[in-house]
């Protein structure tokens, strides 16, 4: 509906000789007495120009020229809000458009010609994927899906490091277990990886090489074998919940020198040094963030010579700019909350437009059964494993539960609820709404010869009861829900919206006879059901969940 209101409001502002860069937001009021849609643009402009908001809203209404039979009435409420009441005919004409656009409903050209990169999961190949990484993975995947609806050319990227200290520990862990299989008894360090997967990797090595590697002290064969097996496991786990990446970026390339040239990390240090933002003290190399008002400087290279996370992250983001991305979305866990602002500051200092970078921080996940916290660790090690969760509740519940709470909130993943076959389970509730419509359409085809691809969309304009109009209006919100979800990097808004669609459809189904109604009304209500099904399907595609036709 934004595209319907925007040009009319802009023309009215022009006729009033009012110029403003304030965005025109069209929203659904929480209370229907305040209209079907509303805008606060009059309030914003009046505040900016020191005018009386109510008076200016009245002037603006007088200059709004909508097509006939679209707006029933307009009112001014509160401090300059303009409320719009639509005609039933126009509401249902707009629902017709949903049927015409089909899978394309909600899509736009907002990002046409622009490149976006979404980086998510990005777990180093040191072990199986945890539930926490899974939440970030689903969040990133949904954000990428949302951006694609707006015509962005999206790259899904996985960033990893196979050359750090943790990989050394991984190699040592595998070697210890391998030596045990060779009959060499050594004490396994408590600081090393304890999971059963380490023994499985060692068993794979032993099966292929026997005891031939017993005298090999170079960790490389142990590291590479572990990396290959673990990465295959990670990719398989992600594929189980519908996540596939387009590219894998190895942090190790940022340390690599071409010929006699510098590595990407070294180049960052030199560029920041030229800007006088590098200091050397306490045996370490520091990013002088105290120069930009921060309390402490931040270490880039530790006294051991090992880079901190910040240095390769800065270099990595520079590669994204060099690769020509217009929008860069990073999905991080809560452990990155203190680090990423320093990366953005460094990029600004180096002349990059950090506003092209958006960061989504997702909070921790706990799993509960019978209200008690549990570990999903039935197979390997003492960790909450994503594979075990998917085994228990399935891919759809895994995905939806991960994003049905705000990314900013700690998530309590209720295993019992995720497995429940009732309307209390959000996944079941959404699936049931879609399956109910599919069942209705099958029955209509059988009993009345209804053709969902046939003519008669205009019959929708016969519908004017409150349940029908409320459902129709909600379906018209779908495109705005996409843009709001993108603006906030919050797929949860889409989950809440689709739940509302399912809820209103169930009410409409109960209150408005469909198959037993007069033929034209019956057909109109079937088309309204079909439009609802289309919105649910389009939304499910963004969330990455299935759309069952029967239950």
Curated annotation (Swiss-Prot):
Compartmental location: Cytoplasm
BP terms from Gene Ontology: arginyl-tRNA aminoacylation
Matches recorded under Pfam families: Arg_tRNA_synt_N, DALR_1, tRNA-synt_1d
Principal location: cytoplasm
Catalyzed reaction equations: tRNA(Arg) + L-arginine + ATP = L-arginyl-tRNA(Arg) + AMP + diphosphate
Keyword Cell division found: no
Record's keyword terms, sorted: Aminoacyl-tRNA synthetase, ATP-binding, Cytoplasm, Ligase, Nucleotide-binding, Protein biosynthesis
Enzyme Commission number(s): 6.1.1.19
GO molecular function terms attached to this record: arginine-tRNA ligase activity; ATP binding
Enzyme class: ligase
Motif 'HIGH' region, residue range(s) on this chain: 123-133
Classification via InterPro entries: Arg-tRNA-ligase, Arg-tRNA-synth_N, Arg-tRNA-synth_N_sf, ArgRS_core, DALR_anticod-bd, Rossmann-like_a/b/a_fold, tRNAsynth_Ia_anticodon-bd
Gene3D superfamilies listed in its UniProt record: Arginyl tRNA synthetase N-terminal domain, HUPs, Isoleucyl-tRNA Synthetase, Domain 1
One GO location term (cellular component): cytoplasm
Oligomer and partners: Monomer.
NCBIfam families: argS
PANTHER family: ARGININE--TRNA LIGASE, CYTOPLASMIC, ARGINYL-TRNA SYNTHETASE
HAMAP family per UniProt: Arg_tRNA_synth (MF_00123)
Family, similarity comment: Belongs to the class-I aminoacyl-tRNA synthetase family.
Protein name: Arginine--tRNA ligase
Gene that this sequence comes from: argS
């Amino acid at each position: 509906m934004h595209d319907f209101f925007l040009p009319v409001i802009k023309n009215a502002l022009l006729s009033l000789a009012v110029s403003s860069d304030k965005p025109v937001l069209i929203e659904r009021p929480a209370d229907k007495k305040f209209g079907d849609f509303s805008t606060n643009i009059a309030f914003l402009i009046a505040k900016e120009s020191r005018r009386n908001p109510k008076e200016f809203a009245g002037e603006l209404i007088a200059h709004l020229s909508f097509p006939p039979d679209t707006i029933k009435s307009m009112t001014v409420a509160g401090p300059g809000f303009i409320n719009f009441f639509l005609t039933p005919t126009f509401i249902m004409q707009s629902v017709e458009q949903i049927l015409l656009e089909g899978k394309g409903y909600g899509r736009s050209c907002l990002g046409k010609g622009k490149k976006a990169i979404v980086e998510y999961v990005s777990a180093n190949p040191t072990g199986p994927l945890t539930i926490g990484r899974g939440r970030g993975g689903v969040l990133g995947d949904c954000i990428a899906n949302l951006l694609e609806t707006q015509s962005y050319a999206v790259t899904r990227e996985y960033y990893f490091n196979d050359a750090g200290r943790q990989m050394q520990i991984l190699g040592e862990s595998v070697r210890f277990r391998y030596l045990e299989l060779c009959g060499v008894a050594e004490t396994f360090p408590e600081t090393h990886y304890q999971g059963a997967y380490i023994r499985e990797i060692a068993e794979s090595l032993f099966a292929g090489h026997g005891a031939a590697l017993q005298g090999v002290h170079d960790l490389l064969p142990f590291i590479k074998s572990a990396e290959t097996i673990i990465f295959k496991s990670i990719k398989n786990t992600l594929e189980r919940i519908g996540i596939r990446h387009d590219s894998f970026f190895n942090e190790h390339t940022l340390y690599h020198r071409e010929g006699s040239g510098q590595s990407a990390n070294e180049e960052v240090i030199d560029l920041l040094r030229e800007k006088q933002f590098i200091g050397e003290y306490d045996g370490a190399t520091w990013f002088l963030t105290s120069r930009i008002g921060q309390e402490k400087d931040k270490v880039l290279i530790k006294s051991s010579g090992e880079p901190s996370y910040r240095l390769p992250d800065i270099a990595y983001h520079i590669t994204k700019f060099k690769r020509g991305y217009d929008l860069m979305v990073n999905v991080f866990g809560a452990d990155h909350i203190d680090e990423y602002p320093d990366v953005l500051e460094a990029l600004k200092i180096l002349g990059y437009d950090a506003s092209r970078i958006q960061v989504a921080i997702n909070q921790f996940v706990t799993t509960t059964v019978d209200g008690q916290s549990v570990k999903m660790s039935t197979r390997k090690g003492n960790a909450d494993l994503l594979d075990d969760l998917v085994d228990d509740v399935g891919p759809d519940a895994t995905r939806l539960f991960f994003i049905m709470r705000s990314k900013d909130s700690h998530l309590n993943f209720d295993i019992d609820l995720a497995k429940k076959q009732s309307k209390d389970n959000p996944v079941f509730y959404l699936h049931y709404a879609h399956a109910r419509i599919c069942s209705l359409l099958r029955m209509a085809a059988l009993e009345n010869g209804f053709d969902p691809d046939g003519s008669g969309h205009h019959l929708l304009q016969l519908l004017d009861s409150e349940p029908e109009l409320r459902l129709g209006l909600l379906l018209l919100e779908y495109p705005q829900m996409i843009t709001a979800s993108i603006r906030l990097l919050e797929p949860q808004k889409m989950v809440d919206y689709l739940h509302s669609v399912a809820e209103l459809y169930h009410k409409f189904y109960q209150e408005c006879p469909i198959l037993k109604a007069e033929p034209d009304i019956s057909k109109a209500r079937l088309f309204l059901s079909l439009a609802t099904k289309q919105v649910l399907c389009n939304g499910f595609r963004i969330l990455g969940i299935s759309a069952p036709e029967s239950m």
